Amino acid sequence: MATKKEKHLTIVERDPYLQPYESALQGRYDYALRKEQELTGGQNLSEWATGYLFFGLHHQKPYTDAKGKKVAGKWVLREWAPNATAIYIKGDMNDWQKDEKYRLQPIGNGVWEVTLPEKAMKHGQMYKLLVEWNGGYGERIPSYARRVVQDEQTKIFSAQVWDEPEYEWKNRKKGKRGKVQSTKEALFIYECHIGMSSEQEKVNSYEEFRRDVLPRIANLGYNCIQIMAIQEHPYYGSFGYHVSNFFAASSRFGTPNELKALIDDAHGRGMKVIMDLVHSHAVKNELEGLGNFDGTPYQYFHDGARREHPAWDSLCFNYGKNEVLHFLLSNCKFWIDEYDFDGFRFDGVTSMIYLSHGLGEDFNGYDSYFGGNVDGDAIMYLTLANKVIHEVKPNAVTIAEEMSGMPGLAYPIADGGVGFDYRLAMGIPDFWIKYIKEVKDEDWKAGHIYYEMTNRREDEKTISYAESHDQALVGDKTIIFRLVDADMYWHFEHGHSNYTVDRGIALHKMIRLITASTINGGYLTFMGNEFGHPEWIDFPREGNGWSYKYARRQWSLVDNPNYFFSDLNRFDNKMVHLLRQHLLIQNPTAEEKQYRVGKHLPWVLKWCDNEGDQVVAYSRGDLLFIFNWNGQKSFADYGILVPEGKYKVVLNTDAKEFAGFGISDDSVEHFTQYDPLYQPDGKGWLKMYLPARSAVVLKKEE
């Protein structure tokens, strides 16, 4: 008699090595389910995560009720501060004095409220809260403040009454995103920072970015922009990662409506817009942030040794506290509901999910992911966050910045995962840095490069990238600068002949092409890196004389046709458009199933891996990619066994228009040659001329 097959979580069925940890995976799922029930009492989680509609400052405008009676307008402010004994509004409206008319009253569960007549506050006025507790007091910015401004003279941050007319969306109708890209497309993400997007030595604005930079991104072909540093942060040089005010779009870049116009314009151009969401920690500042908000160190954060992050000089949220969950989950919904963001890149996920913050950990086996070092509360929070986000916007994009490789982060919640749509392939940029720095050209192994590009959990979508903002920061180097270094200043102009520059330009294109063409979900680049922007990023600070010289983007370099920057930009444009057109999410063919496991994009099928020649070839769908990493040898009539048929060159890194040598004639059609040994399998020999240090992409014709 046959025994009934044991039922496993889907993630375990896909990865049998997870069987010893199935109870831990099931426990995580059950904990998130129990917590959701505890929080909502059975209601919809996204309907519960609406703290921003209750807390903070709200203007209820005058109206006429159903009986024709005029109802006066009013202001209502609510705050959660359980340890407070008294709270007052201080600001321009009362000459910054402690005023009983502006005193909040306790209404239960640590919540305070004040209702004021409409004339009591005006648009543009600055204000703070004076919070008193037993044994002390302090000025605080409301935790749900939607606009926070720094005084140009005193440098002090205050909340600002903000009551501008409601923005009229052009591309937001009944949940539709105008011409926003199809969910069938792979993501091509352009990571950007508003403030440093100007060529001028200044802080750029939302409006200038929308007008000047957004068209550049759209023309390049990227279908998603990832905006850094949106949440308000006191220190510009933190790159937006020391957040103080989680519901306030940074005022140093402009107004809320100007940010909405930027997002609206991007949607109209067919692009998704996601933001860096920092829920992994918070700035320590008390006057600007949440630290000791009501006089206690543990209102939002852990108490004791777990309160301060050992490496980041910041505070760590207590994800096991219901009020903190309400705050953070409401924050997820707020940015979608109020600004029409399409999702988030969650910063610092590794730091969140391990009690050690991942510091000093090797993560060399599955035991690392399921031991006592895991913060179950953080995983529960991330699970609920993904659920809220996708309830509010089903086609939202969530990306985990996670370096340990924990299984299941980018796996559906119901199947045993945490629910992210993608995870960053953080090992790829580290690989490129190591290879460029430590490995001689003749030792670059084509098969090893291919392995590093495709070494991942195939059932979890990833975002691959050769470099992001991290690699461009002061003290580090971008790929182009590692390859070319100071020769960029003297030999990056047409007409110059320089081996270092020629080598660097060739490898820059090849590195980006193999990284982008082997993706399992998406590809990312940072603003300016696509054209080889020179130098590192260094925000204004005391050590550089508060200079903006290296906190900007020199667009004039790429706009000058005499520089190689324009050629690199042209290559990136052609590459992105080509890959977007062909790397569509689809079901695998029978042959693809035979060679690879996975389900997201056309499979990567390797056809050639010749270590001695430094040549590798692979296909995706109807595209064939051939890389010759050999810096010394070009190969004539190089034979590669591929599906028989006609092939046409659609991209060549060595083309003159991309600052190559243009050795090959790309107009020639290529036909496979008959081989009786392989003909029964439908394969033949493709004979190609492969210039040294180049890559070519061919399309198989019908």
Predicted segments with their positions:
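The feature marks proteins involved in alpha-glucan
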Residues: 1-74, 106-191, 196, 201, ...
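Carbohydrate-binding surface patches
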Residues: 57-59, 64, 69-83, 606-641, ...
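Beta-strand-rich binding/interaction modules
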Residues: 77-79, 85-100, 635-653
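Conserved, mostly hydrophobic/aromatic
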Residues: 79, 129, 192, 217, ...
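Short strand-edge motifs at loop-to-beta-strand transitions and within beta-strands
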Residues: 102, 110-114, 684-686
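C-terminal beta-strand-rich structural cap/linker in extracellular carbohydrate-active enzymes
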Residues: 123-125, 666-702
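Substrate-binding/active-site clefts of carbohydrate-active enzymes
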Residues: 149, 167, 172-189, 193-374, ...
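Conserved alpha/beta catalytic core and glycan-binding cleft of carbohydrate-active enzymes
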Residues: 340-342, 361-551, 580-639, 651-654, ...
